[in-house]
Amino acid sequence: MTQKKYSKKTAKKIHQNRRKHYFFRRKILLAILIIALIGTGFYLKQSVSYYYAMYFNKFKHKKLHNTEIEALRIQKILSDNLDKTYGFDISHYQNREDISWDSLSIGNKTIPLEFVVMRATMGNRSADKHFDEFWEQAKKHNLIRGAYHFYRADEDPVVQANNFLENVKLESGDLPPILDIEKIPKRKTNKKLIEDLKVWCKIVEETYGEKPIIYTYYHYYKDFLKGEFDDYPLWLANYNDVPTPSPDDNWDFWQFTENGIVHGINTKVDLDIYNGSLWSLKRLTLD
């Protein structure tokens, strides 16, 4: 094949374009490398800090203790998920004076808690007595906030959705609304329960423009909800000795213990893992 010939001007232009593309590609590769190194650096720093504290600088809460089995289970979960993001749950079961919002951490004070989820409403009319104060404290201390509605399976989904919307004013940077479903209805069929849950979700989604997060226990999800809410963010509670909350399902959050001991809180709390980095968690929040 005869080689195509170019004028000097055209050849020079082609050469310049190739150089531009070459240097552009180098810049892209360099940027990717820098981001990867930063991510690796953060992970290594977290790992080194965690293991150093675990062996040489153990934190012991003055009031709270777990059984050896539970302590080892929690320690293993933390060790296996140092690249993920941690948070906690609170409600009226925690007293206001029990929480020192300035310094909240786990893992021998090496893992900061980045988000907090709090119960806002329950059923048709109830609201958590500490919600408003906890909500403001979380914002004041730059924690990512989440509010959940405890769904009462035999009550009206429209009234329950309105109860949540009247009591919760989500803002930019907050997690999407969270629906907590744990109970089986006594006066409704399971089919009717699913229909009602979808009504609640539809009303709340139309208000905020985001699909609610579905929170439930692993076995409840497997037995009643699986296949019905596949396109919703999933928050599973599983307190067993397992590597993930579900062997079969993708999950976004895992509530892995109800016996969490936190530096800065004088009662045990539920602890949660977000299945990703803090950056990706912020992408999940409301605009």
Where are these regions (language model features)?
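Functionally critical loop-and-helix segments that line ligand-binding/catalytic clefts
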Residues: 57-94, 99, 229-287
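Flexible, glycine-rich phosphate/dinucleotide-binding loops
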Residues: 125, 154, 221, 243, ...
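N-terminal Lys/Arg-rich, disordered targeting/topogenic segments
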Residues: 1-25
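ATP-dependent carboxylate-activation loops
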Residues: 104
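Membrane-proximal basic amphipathic "stem/tether" segments
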Residues: 19-22, 46-64
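Hydrophobic membrane-insertion alpha-helices, especially the h-region
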Residues: 26-47
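Substrate-binding cleft of extracellular glycoside hydrolase catalytic domains
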Residues: 72-77, 82-99, 108-197, 205-207
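Catalytic domains of cell-wall/extracellular-matrix polysaccharide-remodeling enzymes
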Residues: 176-248
